[in-house]
From Swiss-Prot:
One of its GO terms (biological process) is translation. This is Large ribosomal subunit protein uL22. GO terms for molecular function: rRNA binding; structural constituent of ribosome. SUPFAM superfamilies: Ribosomal protein L22. InterPro entries: Ribosomal_uL22 (IPR001063), Ribosomal_uL22_bac/chlpt-type (IPR005727), Ribosomal_uL22_bac/org-type (IPR047867), Ribosomal_uL22_CS (IPR018260), Ribosomal_uL22_sf (IPR036394). This protein binds specifically to 23S rRNA; its binding is stimulated by other ribosomal proteins, e.g. L4, L17, and L20. It is important during the early stages of 50S assembly. It makes multiple contacts with different domains of the 23S rRNA in the assembled 50S subunit and ribosome. CDD domains: Ribosomal_L22. Residues 106-117 have a biased composition (Low complexity).
Length: 127
Protein backbone atom coordinates (compact mmCIF):
# COMPACT_ATOMS: atom_id res chain seq x y z
CA UNK A 1 0.00 0.00 0.00
CA UNK A 2 2.25 2.68 -1.30
CA UNK A 3 2.25 5.70 -3.55
CA UNK A 4 5.09 7.41 -5.38
CA UNK A 5 5.36 10.92 -6.79
CA UNK A 6 8.37 11.36 -9.06
CA UNK A 7 10.06 14.44 -10.48
CA UNK A 8 8.20 16.78 -8.13
CA UNK A 9 9.55 20.33 -8.44
CA UNK A 10 10.39 20.90 -4.79
CA UNK A 11 13.71 20.75 -3.00
CA UNK A 12 14.17 17.42 -1.17
CA UNK A 13 15.54 19.28 1.84
CA UNK A 14 12.33 21.30 2.16
CA UNK A 15 10.09 18.28 1.56
CA UNK A 16 11.90 16.26 4.25
CA UNK A 17 10.98 18.89 6.87
CA UNK A 18 7.31 18.06 6.34
CA UNK A 19 7.87 14.32 5.80
CA UNK A 20 9.50 14.06 9.24
CA UNK A 21 6.32 15.41 10.85
CA UNK A 22 4.07 12.59 9.59
CA UNK A 23 6.40 9.59 9.82
CA UNK A 24 4.88 6.94 12.14
CA UNK A 25 1.54 8.75 12.56
CA UNK A 26 -1.88 7.23 11.87
CA UNK A 27 -3.51 8.08 8.54
CA UNK A 28 -6.14 10.46 9.99
CA UNK A 29 -3.55 12.22 12.17
CA UNK A 30 -1.08 12.58 9.28
CA UNK A 31 -3.82 13.97 7.01
CA UNK A 32 -4.76 16.50 9.70
CA UNK A 33 -1.14 17.56 10.26
CA UNK A 34 -0.63 18.11 6.53
CA UNK A 35 -3.88 20.04 6.19
CA UNK A 36 -2.74 22.60 8.78
CA UNK A 37 0.96 22.79 7.87
CA UNK A 38 1.71 26.03 6.07
CA UNK A 39 4.33 24.71 3.63
CA UNK A 40 4.18 23.96 -0.08
CA UNK A 41 5.51 20.44 0.55
CA UNK A 42 2.52 19.70 2.82
CA UNK A 43 0.12 19.93 -0.13
CA UNK A 44 2.29 17.61 -2.26
CA UNK A 45 2.71 15.08 0.56
CA UNK A 46 -1.04 15.30 1.23
CA UNK A 47 -1.75 14.26 -2.35
CA UNK A 48 0.68 11.32 -2.07
CA UNK A 49 -0.92 10.29 1.26
CA UNK A 50 -4.41 10.36 -0.31
CA UNK A 51 -3.14 8.30 -3.24
CA UNK A 52 -1.64 5.68 -0.89
CA UNK A 53 -4.94 5.52 1.04
CA UNK A 54 -6.89 5.07 -2.21
CA UNK A 55 -4.47 2.31 -3.26
CA UNK A 56 -4.99 0.57 0.10
CA UNK A 57 -8.76 0.77 -0.27
CA UNK A 58 -9.01 -0.30 -3.92
CA UNK A 59 -6.15 -2.79 -4.26
CA UNK A 60 -6.01 -4.34 -0.77
CA UNK A 61 -9.55 -3.86 0.61
CA UNK A 62 -8.07 -2.10 3.65
CA UNK A 63 -9.72 0.66 5.67
CA UNK A 64 -7.35 3.67 5.49
CA UNK A 65 -8.54 4.89 8.92
CA UNK A 66 -6.81 1.88 10.54
CA UNK A 67 -3.48 2.36 8.76
CA UNK A 68 -0.42 4.37 9.73
CA UNK A 69 2.46 5.94 7.81
CA UNK A 70 5.00 3.12 7.87
CA UNK A 71 7.57 4.80 5.63
CA UNK A 72 7.92 8.18 3.98
CA UNK A 73 11.04 8.80 1.94
CA UNK A 74 12.09 11.87 -0.03
CA UNK A 75 14.87 11.11 -2.49
CA UNK A 76 16.64 13.55 -4.76
CA UNK A 77 15.61 13.59 -8.40
CA UNK A 78 17.46 15.14 -11.33
CA UNK A 79 18.45 18.78 -10.98
CA UNK A 80 17.26 21.24 -13.62
CA UNK A 81 20.00 23.76 -14.33
CA UNK A 82 19.31 27.34 -15.35
CA UNK A 83 21.57 30.39 -15.65
CA UNK A 84 20.99 33.86 -14.24
CA UNK A 85 22.84 36.83 -15.73
CA UNK A 86 25.03 38.69 -13.24
CA UNK A 87 27.17 41.79 -13.24
CA UNK A 88 30.10 42.31 -15.63
CA UNK A 89 28.83 39.79 -18.19
CA UNK A 90 29.00 36.83 -15.84
CA UNK A 91 26.36 34.20 -15.18
CA UNK A 92 25.67 31.99 -12.19
CA UNK A 93 23.97 28.62 -12.22
CA UNK A 94 20.56 28.25 -10.60
CA UNK A 95 19.78 24.68 -9.53
CA UNK A 96 16.10 23.77 -9.56
CA UNK A 97 15.97 20.60 -7.52
CA UNK A 98 13.40 17.85 -7.92
CA UNK A 99 12.25 15.13 -5.54
CA UNK A 100 10.98 11.56 -5.65
CA UNK A 101 8.51 11.05 -2.78
CA UNK A 102 7.64 7.51 -1.65
CA UNK A 103 5.01 6.91 1.03
CA UNK A 104 4.00 3.49 2.38
CA UNK A 105 1.04 2.82 4.65
CA UNK A 106 0.98 -0.21 6.93
CA UNK A 107 -1.26 -1.81 9.52
CA UNK A 108 -0.32 -1.87 13.21
CA UNK A 109 0.74 -5.24 14.65
CA UNK A 110 -2.15 -7.69 15.02
CA UNK A 111 -4.56 -5.78 12.77
CA UNK A 112 -5.54 -7.72 9.63
CA UNK A 113 -5.27 -5.79 6.39
CA UNK A 114 -8.41 -6.13 4.28
CA UNK A 115 -9.75 -9.25 2.69
CA UNK A 116 -8.33 -11.52 0.06
CA UNK A 117 -8.09 -9.99 -3.38
CA UNK A 118 -10.12 -11.90 -5.96
CA UNK A 119 -8.25 -12.58 -9.15
CA UNK A 120 -9.65 -14.34 -12.22
CA UNK A 121 -8.98 -18.07 -12.26
CA UNK A 122 -8.84 -18.51 -8.47
CA UNK A 123 -12.31 -20.04 -8.23
CA UNK A 124 -12.47 -23.78 -7.72
CA UNK A 125 -14.52 -25.58 -10.33
CA UNK A 126 -17.66 -27.32 -9.11
CA UNK A 127 -18.45 -30.75 -10.52
Amino acid sequence: MRAVAKYVRISPRKARLVADQIRGKSYPEAASILRFTNKRAARILGDVLKSAAANAENNHDADPELLFVEEVRVDEGPTIKRYRPRALGRATMIRKRTSHITLRLGAPEGVPVGGAVDTPGDEEEEE
